[in-house]
A protein has these predicted regions:
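Aromatic-lined, polymer-binding surfaces characteristic
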Residues: 98
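Histidine-centered, transition-metal-coordinating active-site segments
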Residues: 1-91, 101-432
Length: 432
């Protein structure tokens, strides 16, 4: 193999060097049909309905996660605390590259519909099966069966069980670092700030007891005091991405409509042509073959939506036409102060009034995500080293607001048209 380079807007050049044997393996993995399929799966599902630039794919994100893992591994080399393991390093980079290879189309909507119709196989399970049984598995086994086994173990062990697994899956991992930078870039949002170069420079590796009262120890990444504000801003940006991008009310409307369409197809696959991959998939409930699953991508779903829009005259056809033309359900979000919750009694009364008036609606309560506090597994917290302190402190113990960022779930109701939404507003006003 000669040197290979991929131009990337986040990492500039992602390189595969002819001088590194495992880079040739990584390049072969990228060329497999299973990995190339990720070119046809959007990273953010329906976000481009609101943010037209957000058309990037899980393919580019997976390459970015691999590159981010490489950068994080250099921290281990520079600290010279942990004995280097080429096998572990290669497996870590490989796991970062392949972490999304089992993703289905349309982000998480497709998985929710699959589960509701009896296919209870999550994308993480498909990832493991692809690494085990596809061309990807063959390439890894032919190079080194130990790396194949080690790479697969990242998707089986408990998150954050050692430094290498922390790079692949944790609150500050290669996946999250890349998608936050990438999603901000392609959506164009400006809130918060992410400074991975500074955070990396402020990362230390310390051998710590599992909790302050335990004698058992593990190596962990620890943020130095100089990186405190940067890690706070990182979690602020993470929370805002969920609030303003991933859970945007308009893209959620499109998700709800797509979910209704796919649910109708799952219940009656006969409305699709004989060899439609989506029809074959839903007819193979509860356990589709791997080859059936990996035929699915966003292009298959949208071609099916086009077919339904043009070949039926029922509710599914109407929904499909509306989705194609961005004629979306209308949202009414119950008003409330930030970080507070809606009174459940009041919300229940509102829903009863809606039903009494014969109104059709969909409720949506997305859970805001932010910093997660671990009470029983202390080392999974983001730890900050404080000058003069012998043991680092968890981020939530130092920040006045980082734990509160994810509070205050939105309480939304979606209606088929503007008229119904306005009626709903009047009903809510009457009970306030």
């Amino acid at each position: 193999m000669r040197d290979q380079r991929i131009r990337d807007p986040i990492h500039d050049l992602i390189k595969f060097s002819a001088n590194r044997k495992f880079d040739e393996v990584l390049w072969k993995l990228v060329q497999t049909s299973e990995f190339q399929r990720l070119r046809r799966i959007a990273q953010l599902g329906f976000a481009e309905i609101v943010y037209p630039g957000a058309t990037h794919t899980r393919f580019s994100h997976s390459l970015g996660a691999m590159e981010m893992a490489r950068k994080m591994l250099t921290i281990l080399k520079h600290n010279q605390v942990v004995q280097e393991s080429e096998n572990d390093e290669n497996a870590t980079v490989c796991a970062a590259l392949l972490h999304d290879v089992g993703h289905g189309p349309l982000s998480h909507v497709f998985e929710e519909v699959s589960e509701s119709c009896g296919i209870k196989i999550h994308h993480e399970d498909w990832t493991k099966q692809i690494i085990e049984d596809s061309n990807i598995g063959t390439i890894l086994k032919d190079f080194d069966s130990a790396i194949h086994k080690n790479g697969l173990s990242f998707f089986e062990v408990e998150h954050g069980s050692d430094l290498y697994s922390t790079i692949v899956s944790s609150q500050f991992d290669a996946d999250r670092l890349d998608f936050m930078l990438r999603d901000r870039y392609f959506t164009g949002v400006k809130f918060g700030s992410i400074d991975p170069a500074w955070i990396f420079d402020c990362l230390q590796i310390q051998q710590l007891s599992i909790d302050p009262d335990s004698e058992a120890e593990k190596y962990r990444f620890v943020v130095s005091q100089k990186g405190f504000s940067a890690i706070e801003n990182y979690f602020y940006a993470y929370t805002e991405l969920y609030s303003k991008v991933y859970f945007h009310k308009t893209s959620r409307a499109a998700q709800i409509m797509m979910k209704q369409i796919l649910s109708a197809v799952a219940q009656d696959p006969e409305i699709l042509p004989k060899n439609n991959p989506l029809k074959v998939y839903f007819e193979s409930t509860p356990k589709p073959l791997l080859e059936t699953y990996i035929r699915l991508d966003d292009s298959i779903i949208w071609a099916t939506i086009r077919f339904l829009a043009e070949n039926n005259s029922n509710q599914v056809s109407n929904l499909s036409q509306r989705l194609l033309n961005r004629n979306l359900f209308k949202c009414f979000e119950l008003p409330k102060p930030p970080k507070e919750e809606i009174d459940p009694i009041k919300a229940g009364k509102f829903e009863r009034r809606l039903k009494e008036n014969g109104m059709k609606f969909e409720r949506d309560r997305p859970q805001r995500k932010g910093y997660k506090v671990y009470d029983t597994d202390y080392l999974k917290n983001i730890l900050v080293s404080i000058e003069g302190e012998t043991y680092p402190k968890a981020l939530d113990k130092l920040s006045n607001w980082v734990e509160d960022m994810s509070k205050g779930r939105p309480h939304r109701y979606y209606f088929e048209n503007t008229e119904d939404r306005e009626i709903a507003k009047e009903i809510y006003k009457a009970i306030s």
